[in-house]
Amino acid sequence: MATHSSSSSSPEVSVAAAETAWSDLRTLVGGEHVRAAIAEDAVDGVVPQMVIEPGSPEEVAGALKIATSAGLHVIPRGGGTKMDWGNLLRNNESRSGELLLSTRRLNRIVEHAWGDMTATVEAGCTFQRFQQTLAQHGQRLALDPLWPDSATIGGILATNDSGALRVRIGSLRDLIIGITLALPDGTLAKSGGKVVKNVAGYDLPKLATGSLGTLGIITQAIFRLHPVPRESRTLSFSNSEGGTSDGGSMNTLALAIQDCNMVPTGVQIRAGSASTPELGLHELDLRFEGTATGCEAQIEQTLRIASGARRIESPADVWNVRSTLWSGAEPSLVCKFSLLPVDLGTFLDLIRKASALLHLPWRLVAQAVGVGYLRIEGSDVAVLLHAVEDLRKKLESRGGSLVILRCPLEIKSKIDVWGSAGDALPLMRSIKAQFDRTGVLNPGRFVGGI
């Protein structure tokens, strides 16, 4: 497990290269925007050597070129909300250390073409600020990511963080239409939107989404926008109301609703063990958006399928419940799973059996039915590791996946948090080599140690 600080490594040539890089970086962005790293900058126990805050896409590209020449590993950081996602950083003891590159100063909303319903924004802009600006013209980026007040656009893209809105509107890859990436060789690659330059024929916006900053550092993105709905209504069904008895029944109801003419913009299933009643044993949440008349018509049609729903007066609490999975007793695991929507009931049964056998409290929030988040708590790290390996094996056998987002470092050192990439891994390594030949960006943190 790599827990070293970069200051503890380095042959003399690497130390000299790092000192030259520090000087060059100060010249590039100004001395006030380069500093020595502190303990709070650590990523999974690795304290970088220095922190830089470029102020433009060109400065990001220039910083990457300097870092590559000096043999520095580069760790991108936006709002810092998901810095513990991914595998352990590959040890850099034979090189010069690590450079943490913050996009904090890249926070401009470059253009809001409200007539075309598109917007261009820099990577360091927070999601909340972006939404507030778009709302002035009655528009929005139709996403509901985690921690919207502090999560940045670049970080949301790098981690592919969508939410319940994807049921109707689509995922992040459906909304991004252009991107600018700073590459390790110091160039800016642009694709989509109004831009003219493509990179080797790749669909760069989709490729960069979810890549955890391992191909290039996102500096700008162009998005397709949607109108802010006039009205929104949230209904919730529970296992004690409406005749449903478990999460599988809730899932069946959710699928039945989506198979009819109703078009909820949010579908969410909440579940938990008896020791986590604050989440509700089994709850199904539906969000309808549009005109008041349209929302009420869809609610009326929904109630013809299943009775016992209650209207939620504070819907923000319901739709933000996913973020509560990051709080609770430790040690714990927080995982993201994906599966066929029809398999969610079976997955819930597997979780219940494992929880009962190993005495592990759990909570689950499934958004878009086939994509969700699971928290498992336990006093023994070895038991947690056994539980997640068993659940992952069973999910992967049915074509699903289980990615560990947060866990103790002891577990991270023993497992690939991403799971198996299967036959896709050689292709992923090939793409990585084309964009980042020397492995400068977030080395080791992506799938298969990429």
Task: Put a short name on every predicted segment.
Residues 2-4, 10-75:
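N-terminal, positively charged, Ser/Thr/Ala/Gly-biased leader segments
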Residues 2-6, 11-13, 46-49, 72, ...:
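Conserved glycine-rich FAD pyrophosphate-binding loop
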Residues 42-75, 91-93, 99-147, 161-194, ...:
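N-terminal glycine-rich flavin-associated loop
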Residues 53, 238, 287-289, 338, ...:
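Short hydrophobic/aromatic beta-strand micro-patches
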Residues 59-62, 129, 243-252, 293-300, ...:
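Short, conserved charged micro-motifs
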Residues 68, 135, 258, 356, ...:
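Anion (oxyanion) recognition and catalysis
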Residues 158, 177-333:
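C-terminal substrate-binding/cap subdomain adjacent to the FAD-binding core in PCMH-type
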